[in-house]
Curated annotation (Swiss-Prot):
Residues 261-266 are annotated as: Important for the catalytic mechanism of dephosphorylation. Transmembrane segments: none annotated. Its cofactor is Mg(2+). Its EC number is 2.7.11.-, 2.7.4.-. Gene3D superfamilies: HprK N-terminal domain-like, P-loop containing nucleotide triphosphate hydrolases. Catalyzes the ATP- as well as the pyrophosphate-dependent phosphorylation of a specific serine residue in HPr, a phosphocarrier protein of the phosphoenolpyruvate-dependent sugar phosphotransferase system (PTS). HprK/P also catalyzes the pyrophosphate-producing, inorganic phosphate-dependent dephosphorylation (phosphorolysis) of seryl-phosphorylated HPr (P-Ser-HPr). Both phosphorylation and phosphorolysis are carried out by the same active site and suggest a common mechanism for both reactions. Mg(2+) binds at residues 158, 199. This is HPr kinase/phosphorylase. One of its GO terms (molecular function) is magnesium ion binding. It comes from Clostridium botulinum (strain Alaska E43 / Type E3). It comes from the Bacteria. PANTHER family: HPR KINASE_PHOSPHORYLASE, PROTEIN YJDM-RELATED.
Length: 304
């Protein structure tokens, strides 16, 4: 993943002082304040990072003798820098403009305070550069829990999502789920062209937002649980106690997975609601229902 400098300019309303190479891409989510570099120290310098000059760096340059400043700026901008942003609306020194034009480096300006600008850019890049993947399935928010419904085509994922929406829960995406990893969590969202849309066999595509209101759709949701649908098989030994701990790896993060056998007569929407509430209960409770039953059996045995 990469972010173009032009996109950064548009998203942060940056003023362009010097236009640089249009093919340059931002590929790391860190920034650098070049105080050490302007002092002549280049060990561990990362020119691929966005360079931000704030009041401290600007004042340091301002106090330099002109010839020294020219040499320092010339060396600094001789590196293959992605782009340079000057904060607080400060005026760049002439040496920066001259050397940036010579080396085809973007020089931008922001009115924001340096620390706030760094914080915003870091969070922005962490989001835009996060590892991504796309999975086939339906993502819904059930009782505040993000549940990814998977299974073969035609097994009833979208129909179940529709029933959940009717029961007051919310849709994030149907059919294609875009997933990105952010700080150890998985965030699911919808491709732009299918936001708020749900495909139901026999009816076609329905606009969930128009039929059920704006509150029935979410832009994104953290994925906490996977419900995998499969056709009921009589010879399968399905989990009946909730002790089978299955996980699915997505972008290196394990997500709890429950296999739900599907056959006529089973109310799958109600089962998913129960799974969501039970998942929340498991996070809050130190004892599982199986443990409670075992304790009761022990108590009965002791009484006998």
């Amino acid at each position: 993943m990469a972010v173009s400098v032009k996109r950064l300019i548009n998203d942060f309303d940056l003023e362009v002082l010097v236009e640089g190479n249009e093919d340059v891409k931002i590929e790391v989510n860190d920034v650098n304040r070049p105080g050490l570099q302007l002092a002549g120290f280049y060990n561990y310098f990362a020119p691929e990072r966005i360079q931000i000059i704030g009041k401290a760096e600007w004042s340091f340059l301002q106090d330099m003798q002109i010839e020294v400043r020219k040499k320092r700026v010339k060396k600094y901008l001789s590196f293959n820098i992605t782009c340079l942003i000057i904060s607080r609306g400060l005026d760049p020194h002439e040496e920066f403009i001259k050397e940036a034009r010579k080396n085809n480096i973007w020089v931008l300006r922001s009115k924001s305070v340096t620390t706030k600008l760094i914080s915003k850019i870091t969070l922005y890049l962490a989001d835009k550069l996060a590892p991504e993947t796309r999975l086939h399935g339906v993502l819904v928010d059930v009782s505040g829990i993000g549940i990814l419904i998977t299974g073969e085509s035609g097994i009833g994922k979208s129909e179940t999502a529709l029933e959940l929406i009717k029961r007051g829960h919310r849709l994030i995406t149907d059919d294609a789920v875009d997933i990105r990893e952010s700080d150890g969590t998985l965030i699911g969202s919808s491709p732009k062209i299918t936001i708020g849309m749900l495909e139901v066999r026999g009816i076609g595509i329905i606009d969930v937002t128009q039929l059920y209101g704006l509150s029935s759709v979410l832009e994104e949701k953290e994925i906490k649980l996977i419900m995998h649908f499969e056709h009921w098989k009589d010879d399968n030994d399905y989990d009946r106690l909730g002790i089978d701990n299955q996980y699915m790896d997505i972008l290196g993060i394990p997500v709890k997975k429950l296999t739900v056998p599907v056959r006529p007569g089973r109310n799958i929407a109600v089962i998913i609601e129960a799974a969501a509430v039970n998942y929340r209960y498991s996070l809050m409770s130190k004892i599982s229902p199986v443990d409670i039953i075992e304790n009761r059996m022990s108590a009965v045995s002791d009484e006998a």
